A protein has these predicted regions:
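A short, exposed helix-loop element centered on a Lys and neighboring polar residues
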Residues: 85-86, 130
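Conserved NAD(P)H cofactor-binding loop of Rossmann-fold oxidoreductase domains
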Residues: 54-59, 219
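Substrate-binding pocket helix/loop in short-chain dehydrogenase/reductase
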Residues: 61-63, 69-74, 100, 179
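Short, small/polar-rich loop/turn modules that mediate ligand/substrate recognition or access, typified
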Residues: 138-143, 209-211
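Short C-terminal tail/terminal secondary-structure segment
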Residues: 110, 199, 210-225
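Catalytic loop of short-chain dehydrogenase/reductase
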Residues: 99-138, 150-152
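A conserved structural motif in NAD(P)-dependent oxidoreductases
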Residues: 168-172, 183-194, 205
Length: 225
């Protein structure tokens, strides 16, 4: 929650002070709410780089999800990123530079049965970005891409695997080991690797990439395209 964010911000401030000298501001807010977004934009509005990464909806069986559960997932994982894009993209275009990266999921390309809420909501965002990224924004130096993580060693992975273990009746260790063996790299990714890919997409070096869905999954997706 807010305490974790504050700890991360403290470390980031220390790192920047010792290297680039850049200043760091942080806001603890629920970005999926109107009030949370207002709190962020009260600090500043002229963002050149925006990375959206709302927490994924819970795994489960679609038969147990009520309409409100679906709406909450769509609001957080589709509509919130769209609102953030809407609030920043025209300013980016006016300044001639902008980078937007949406953290979605490899389930967009290879849906996972217990992640139906994520599959649906994030696929909607993917379709929206496919159109917007190829509009006049591309000629204004603004790129919009999606970064699709596979199985990374995070709390989110553990939550998903816990759901799979409960559904199958297997132990957590057995489910984790079986999942690991499906990945050609034979391991889970680490957050530092993921951050480096995201940093590249936000850099000037990625100026000719837009509207792409970039998979980082250790080779797990077996499709040609």
């Amino acid at each position: 929650g807010a305490e974790v964010l504050q700890q991360a911000a403290t470390h980031l401030i220390a790192d920047c002070a010792g290297s680039s000298g850049a200043s760091v501001l942080f806001v603890a807010a629920d970005i999926t709410t109107v009030e949370g977004r207002a709190a962020v934009f009260s600090v500043r509005k002229d963002f050149d780089i925006v990375v959206t990464n709302a927490g994924g909806p819970p795994p489960g069986d679609f038969r147990s999800w009520e309409r409100d559960t679906w709406i909450k997932a769509i609001d957080a994982n589709m509509l919130t990123p769209i609102e953030l894009i809407k609030a920043t993209v025209d300013g980016m275009a006016a300044r001639g530079f902008g980078r937007i990266v949406n953290i979605t999921s490899s389930a967009v390309k290879a849906p996972i049965d217990i992640l139906g809420l994520s599959n649906g909501a994030r696929s909607g965002l993917t379709g929206f970005v496919a159109g917007l990224s190829r509009s006049k924004l591309a000629a204004s130096g603004v790129t919009i891409n999606n970064l699709l993580p596979g199985a990374f060693d995070t709390d989110r992975l553990k939550t998903t695997m816990k759901g799979a273990a409960e559904k199958s009746g297997q132990s957590m260790d057995a489910v984790m080991d079986a999942r690991r063996k499906t990945i050609p790299a034979q391991r889970f990714g680490n957050p530092q690797e993921f951050g480096a890919i995201c940093a590249f997409l936000c850099s000037t070096h990625a100026g000719y990439m837009t509207g792409q869905n970039v998979l980082a999954d250790g080779g797990a997706y077996s499709g040609t395209f």
